[in-house]
């Protein structure tokens, strides 16, 4: 998240929700840790409309696994503690 982290993103999302604005979450080339944090944050906001968190696919490898799953173009978090990364 290029806005200052999870806290700043939630603050922006709250302001948008108060004003009836829907959200689109996106990223640049990011690790699975960062994308997992953004996905968890996006899914916690009722005004999230679109999610485009595919930056990991541009990277050749990552230090961790897990974090989320992507099936049929739909991203979802894993049923694991924390961000679900290991």
Each model region followed by its residue ranges:
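Catalytic-core signal marking the mid-to-C-terminal active-site face
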Residues: 79
């Amino acid at each position: 998240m290029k806005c200052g982290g999870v806290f700043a993103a939630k603050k922006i999302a709250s302001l948008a929700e108060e004003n009836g604005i829907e959200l689109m979450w996106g990223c640049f080339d990011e690790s699975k840790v960062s994308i997992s944090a953004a996905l968890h944050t996006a899914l916690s906001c009722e005004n999230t409309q679109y999610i485009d968190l595919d930056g990991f696919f541009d990277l050749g490898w990552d230090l961790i696994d897990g974090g989320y799953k992507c099936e049929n173009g739909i991203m979802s978090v894993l049923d694991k503690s924390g961000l679900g990364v290991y």
